[in-house]
Amino acid sequence: MTEKLKQGIDQLGLKVAETIQQSMLAFLAFLQKWNQAYNLTAITEIKSMITHHLLDSLSILPYLKGDKILDVGSGAGFPGIPLAFACPEKKFTLIDSKAKKTAFLLQAASRFKITNVTIIQERVGSYQPGFYFDTITCRALGSVREIMEQTNHLLRSGGQWLIMKGTYPEKELRGTDASAIVHVLNVPGLKAERHLVEVKNNKG
C-alpha cells in the first residue's frame, strides 16, 4: 500500500514526505476501524481508499491558495485531512453537521497530532467564525450554486471556491459566476471522471 500511495503522489506531480505518507496510511487504517461501527464511508478497503479518498483529495492540492482553508461537509475528512497533512503551514477548518463524523475527525486529529485543523459540528449556513477564509473546498455535497450560496458569507473577497465533482457539471454551471473555471482531475488509478470547479469570489 505504501508503494501504491507513493506512485500515485508521484504521478500527480506532488512532493509529500514519506513520513507524511505513512501518517496518511495510518489515518486510513483508523478510518477503516471506525467505519465498522459508524459507517463513515462506503469505501471499505484500504487499496480503494488510497485511490478514491487520498489521491482524489490530493489532486486539488496545486489549486489551493491562501492560509485559511474551510472544508465544507468534510464527512470522514476528505479532502480536508489529506490536504492538512500535506500542508502543515496552512490552517484548515473542517465542518460537518453530523456528530458521528465530527467525533471521528476530533479523534483522528488528536491521535495523529494534526495540529493545523479545527473541527466544527454545525450547519455551514449558521457558522460565524468571525473571520473570512481564503479557500473553501467541498466534495460531493450539493450543487455548485447551493454551495456558493451557503458559504458566501465565509469567503473573503478575492478568495476562491474549489468544488469537486464527478462528470462535467454542465447544468450546474448555468447561471453561476462567469469566472468559473473547470479543471479535469486525473486521479491515478481512478477510472471515473473527476472535475474541479474553481470560482473566484468577486464580491466587493
From Swiss-Prot:
Keyword Methyltransferase: yes
Organism of derivation: Coxiella burnetii (strain CbuG_Q212) (Coxiella burnetii (strain Q212))
Gene3D superfamilies: Vaccinia Virus protein VP39
GO terms under cellular component: cytosol
Entry superkingdom: Bacteria
EC number: 2.1.1.170
EC category name: transferase
Protein name: Ribosomal RNA small subunit methyltransferase G
Localisation: Cytoplasm
Family from the record: Belongs to the methyltransferase superfamily. RNA methyltransferase RsmG family.
Catalyzed reaction equations: guanosine(527) in 16S rRNA + S-adenosyl-L-methionine = N(7)-methylguanosine(527) in 16S rRNA + S-adenosyl-L-homocysteine
NCBIfam families given in the database record: rsmG_gidB
Annotated SUPFAM superfamilies: S-adenosyl-L-methionine-dependent methyltransferases (SSF53335)
Its job: Specifically methylates the N7 position of guanine in position 527 of 16S rRNA.
InterPro entries named among the record's database cross-references: rRNA_ssu_MeTfrase_G, SAM-dependent_MTases_sf
Residues holding S-adenosyl-L-methionine: G73, F78, R139
Gene name in the database record: rsmG
GO molecular function: rRNA (guanine-N7-)-methyltransferase activity
Keywords annotated in UniProt: Cytoplasm, Methyltransferase, rRNA processing, S-adenosyl-L-methionine, Transferase
Taxon lineage: Bacteria, Pseudomonadati, Pseudomonadota, Gammaproteobacteria, Legionellales
The keyword Iron-sulfur is annotated on this UniProt entry: no
Membrane-spanning residues: none
